[in-house]
Amino acid sequence: MQKAFRNVLVIAIIGVIIFGVFSYINGNGNTPKQLSYSQFVEKLDKGDLKTLEIQPEQNVYLVSGKTKNDEDYSSTILYNNEKDLQKITNEAKSQKGLDFKVKEEEKQSVFVSMLTTLIPVLIIAFLFIFFLSQAQGGGGGGRMMNFGKSKAKMYDNQKRRVRFSDVAGADEEKQELIEIVDFLKDNKKFKQMGSRIPKGVLLVGPPGTGKTLLARAVAGEAGAPFFSISGSDFVEMFVGVGASRVRDLFENAKKNAPCIIFIDEIDAVGRQRGAGVGGGHDEREQTLNQLLVEMDGFGENEGIIMIAATNRPDILDPALLRPGRFDRQIQVGRPDVKGREAILHVHSKNKPLDETVDLKAISQRTPGFSGADLENLLNEASLIAAREGKNKIDMRDIEEATDRVIAGPAKKSRVISDKERNIVAHHEAGHTVIGMVLDEAEVVHKVTIVPRGQAGGYAMMLPKQDRFLMTEPELLDKICGLLGGRVSEDINFHEVSTGASNDFERATQIARSMVTEYGMSKKLGPLQFSSSGGGQVFLGKDMQGEPNYSGQIAYEIDKEVQRIIKEQYERCKQILLDHEKELKLIAKTLLTEETLVAEQIRSLFYDGVLPEVDYDAARVVKDEDSDYSEGKYGKSYDDIREEQLEEGKEDMREDRKEDNDMNRERRHRQRDDRDNQTGHDQLRDGSNGDNDQHRGHSNNEEDTGHEQSPNIDKPYNPNDPNNPSNR
């Protein structure tokens, strides 16, 4: 944009200079004094004029010359004023000291006439093209007309090369992408096996989980060209531009094959066609159609691998997700506790941390945080430390940053009455006591009555470990914990406030999900009741969200939700009445301390004593021999490849062992059969036929009396040692 503005400014300055020179040449550089007709006649009559020149021009006579004081002057005489013109001419001729001339009308040159006509047209055309190119995002200069050119940027792997070891908390996702790296490095072994590498890989996951970073790591490991573009860069105000940019993108990719094309937020262009409001957008549909053809159409895109990222796979067009286009979908989820610790090490490598900082403990306190959330957490902690003039980031800074990220900045200057503080303290104490009693699912980490964001206070409840499933008792405990604040207000003040609205919203949502989604209602049974539209209106889906159950079922669902909430309300009330002493003690302590951490809460609840927490006394022993100290935060390409080769070798060893065991067993059976056959022949040679048959039966109970057992109604088994064809 700045370059385009400079170009326009230079052109404008050049135009002004040319116009000024042209005006100077035509006007000889002098600006004469303009006289009215009466002033001119008066000076002529007085004899004040030294020279006089009359020249016809268009509809007037131009009068110019010099006065006796050597001042330039000019005036005009209208064409229809012939009488005055004749009078002025006679008067000028009669004056002896006056140099009088009459010139013929000068015809304007063709060049000047064309220039005068074309300059406004050229200026308007230039401004039109410039603003049009700006609307298209093409910039100025030589890119003005490049509407259909791709906006993809080619990433240079040599400047900021990202490796698999730089990506933390996504080891399984890297294992899924390892074949892409191998194919870009050397595709001979895949061709020998007749394999077809996936043409496209769709990275699906919540925002901030590292989908773009994984794509860059694939390009960095393979050393291949990496084209990066956003899905919104294809669709513009003109129809056909998006399809043209798709064609140009693949043409550039073919010139640099093998390479990677990465489309971020592909749902902007890959939304399902003709669905919902805005679904029938012609430009987007044309762009998507061109993308589908380029990925898997009549043309061959050998060596081009598409990687796309989205957090809304449900709205993508089915044609985009079929095999041959995006063959593989990789779920990039939020990291577990080990992944969060590795990510914290990645983002803390350029930050001075105090000895009190325990990144493992922080990872345990941040369940559900994505990589972007953890980076923001440490950045907030560094800003807090810098604001307070510290040289290092300590654990208190990280605790404060965690509270800011979860609940917002503290509103310590907010004026709150004593009554409101008392209500908030008992409200949060109710949550805390329920959390201490029902700690199967979650435990209390911190409780505060300092206002943050929209909340007057909050209790931080953390799960004991990362959870992927929740049982019915755990969900009921969660509802009970959410109701603890309102029940505590009711018990202590016999009146309720508006502070529990968010608690009710969350509790009701959990109860409704238990009934309609999880099948946890004994009355309605293990059924799922959902709307046909998926429960939400989105521009890529139909807006109709009609329920697929009757009004009577809807009434029963509401009754079941009410029953669950009422039962947990009464259960919560009984728990708080049984622990009323602890409830009042925690509320009283909150009014004086304002914030309590887990260690203090446990001591108050079990011992009735408030301990002092010394953050500076904690020292974390760091393992200098760990991979983090060597700058390795995740499994590298070599580590993953070595693990896969080792797994392959282990499978081969197990298969070989199985084959050896089977061969050994077959040889044993064959030897036993030969021994039995030899004994049978000896007995038959030394006795008559009847005795032979009798003795044969005594040696082999399964012998039928035939030299070869008949193979009647028995399927052929190649491993059967009793089958003569296998001997």
Swiss-Prot record:
Binding residue positions for ATP: G205, P206, P207, G208, T209, G210, K211, T212
Region (Disordered): 645-727
Cytoplasmic side: 1-6, 132-727
Cofactor(s) listed in the protein's UniProt record: Zn(2+)
PROSITE patterns: AAA
Compartments (UniProt record): Cell membrane
Active site: E428
Entry keywords, A to Z: ATP-binding, Cell membrane, Hydrolase, Membrane, Metal-binding, Metalloprotease, Nucleotide-binding, Protease, Transmembrane, Transmembrane helix, Zinc
Principal location: membrane
HAMAP family reported in the protein's UniProt record: FtsH
NCBIfam families named in the record: FtsH_fam
The protein, known as: ATP-dependent zinc metalloprotease FtsH
Species: Staphylococcus haemolyticus (strain JCSC1435)
